[in-house]
């Protein structure tokens, strides 16, 4: 069972300086993949050896998981992978702003913590300010991939992304949910869900050429995002 932390607690509201690609990687000019909410890092530990031409960064708010993932990375001697501890909605925007143009080419948000209730909206990982920061860092054609096994978790993410008008779905994707994972390695949660015969809801987006919206405008739209079945879920 996943252990939640409250990202709005005082401890997690303290900004953390994050190392630049030059500080993390010997070959820092490689294209960058950012995995938001990487948990114990099993997905990236499997992916990084298959994509040595990429640098991979996993960010996670649960510090013990980051320490565990970093130990595994060091044992495997993966020099194109790093794990960072932070609250992405506090510390990531400045890091994204400092990246060289078009270095960030792929972003994944997979099976985020299920803050169901609307009053917990600000605890959800994909906030308007983070989406704008990602949209600003991603050049046209670069990709954002999201997936979850909980429909009421991924639907608000989809609504926020599409309300931003910064992303489009690939032209050959006509299904409500993408049927296959575009990545060659599943997450631990994905394997578990599929082994149970349950559905995974996926969306792949490409950055379009529209300018990122003003934060206040997107926040106003975000307040309209609601989960009508929220009362069916207990507090987390």
UniProtKB/Swiss-Prot annotation:
EC number per UniProt: 2.1.1.33
GO CC term (a single one): tRNA methyltransferase complex
Annotated residues for binding of substrate: 117, 149
Residues that, per the record, bind S-adenosyl-L-methionine: 35, 60, 87, 113
Catalytic activity field: guanosine(46) in tRNA + S-adenosyl-L-methionine = N(7)-methylguanosine(46) in tRNA + S-adenosyl-L-homocysteine
Uppermost EC category: transferase
Keywords on record: Methyltransferase, S-adenosyl-L-methionine, Transferase, tRNA processing
Pathway: tRNA modification; N(7)-methylguanine-tRNA biosynthesis
Alphabetized NCBIfam families for the sequence: tRNA (guanosine(46)-N7)-methyltransferase TrmB (TIGR00091)
General function of this protein: Catalyzes the formation of N(7)-methylguanine at position 46 (m7G46) in tRNA.
The protein's name in its UniProt record: tRNA (guanine-N(7)-)-methyltransferase
Provenance organism: Prochlorococcus marinus (strain MIT 9303)
